């Protein structure tokens, strides 16, 4: 997801800036939750600016929810567990549950839904890797906001995924942290990419037309190119790359 292509990062001067205020106007009753986060980080300039960045972009994003989403995920679960022919799995599920359609789901907007606890959790974990990883100092703040900070990739359901995926992927980079190249983000990124690339996956172009799967894609390890791109994105963000 290219957040910056939709809305340029503001310095949040003069309070929280016009773009943030415009987003807050769209938040409705949820405005108070977002303002809690701005207040929470008012003494930490970087975290405050990061909060502004996320809030500015929230009007452009949302997610789907509904019971039909369970059937959509069932496709990935079966495919991952059995490694069956993807077309057979898709046809069997359609016969059992009927065709999947986004019209069966309810769309919710981030700006009206994201609460303060959720947002603080993501910001804290994003800054943990920014400030603790040796390569973090060599990732510009703009790049951090654009590629590491976002809590979502597309239209997947909201979830607090950072801690779990940090604990999963961070040990892979123990060697990077003790290397003479520890401060080089590219060096760490290559190590992580090489490690993840060795995982057995099932690639298929057969897929019900639906939203992004979300962080569970790292467990499914099956699907089309979009899902493997998402898997890499979650892993890299979780460790500050």
Question: What is each of the regions a protein language model found here?
Answer:
Residues 1-8:
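Bacterial N-terminal signal peptides
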Residues 12-189, 194, 217, 238:
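N-terminal accessory/pre-domain segments preceding catalytic cores
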Residues 176-241:
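Active-site neighborhood of thiol-dependent amide/isopeptide-bond enzymes
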């Amino acid at each position: 997801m290219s957040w910056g292509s939709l809305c340029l990062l503001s310095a949040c001067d003069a309070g929280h800036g016009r773009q943030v205020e415009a987003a807050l106007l769209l938040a409705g009753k949820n405005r108070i939750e977002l303002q809690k986060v701005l207040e929470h980080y008012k003494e930490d300039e970087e975290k405050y600016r990061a909060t502004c960045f996320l809030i500015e972009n929230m009007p452009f994003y949302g997610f789907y929810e509904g019971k039909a989403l369970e059937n959509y995920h069932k496709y990935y679960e079966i495919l991952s567990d059995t490694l069956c022919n993807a077309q057979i799995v898709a046809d069997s599920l359609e016969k059992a549950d009927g065709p999947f359609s986004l019209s069966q789901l309810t769309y919710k907007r981030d700006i009206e839904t994201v609460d303060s606890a959720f947002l603080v959790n993501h910001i804290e974990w994003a800054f943990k890797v920014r400030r603790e990883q040796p390569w973090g100092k060599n990732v510009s703040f703009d790049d951090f906001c654009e590629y590491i900070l976002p809590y979502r990739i597309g239209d997947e359901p909201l979830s607090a995924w950072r801690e779990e995926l940090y604990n999963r992927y961070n040990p892979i980079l123990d060697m990077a942290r003790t290397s003479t190249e520890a401060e080089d983000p590219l060096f760490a990124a290559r190590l992580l990419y090489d490690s993840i690339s060795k995982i057995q996956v099932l690639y298929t172009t057969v897929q019900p037309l639906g939203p992004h799967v979300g962080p569970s894609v790292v467990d499914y390890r099956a699907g089309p190119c979009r899902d493997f791109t998402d898997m890499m994105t979650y892993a890299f963000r979780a460790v500050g790359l």
